[in-house]
Amino acid sequence: MLATKMSVTFCFLLMLTTVMLPTEAKTVAGRTACTQHTSCDTPGAKYCCQNSDCCGGSEHFCASFGQCMRSF
């Protein structure tokens, strides 16, 4: 009986961890990208949170990894 309870508890914790990890990682990645937001005057790669953060008007968009990219 004790082995069954421990097995059920272990499975529950494993399931909970599996569900929570991707969400937490995404939040951390989103925060990292947004704290690295750069202005148009800074040379080099531009980091962003949304499309309007990118310089160059509608030709540029904010990629999912938080960097401005030029659309082709």
From Swiss-Prot:
Residues 22-31 form a propeptide. Residues 1-21 form the signal peptide. It is found in: Secreted. Expressed by the venom duct. GO terms for cellular component: extracellular region. It comes from the Eukaryota. Contains 4 disulfide bonds. Keywords: Disulfide bond, Secreted, Signal, Toxin. One of its GO terms (molecular function) is toxin activity. Belongs to the teretoxin H (TH) superfamily. The cysteine framework is XI (C-C-CC-CC-C-C). This is Teretoxin Tan11.1.
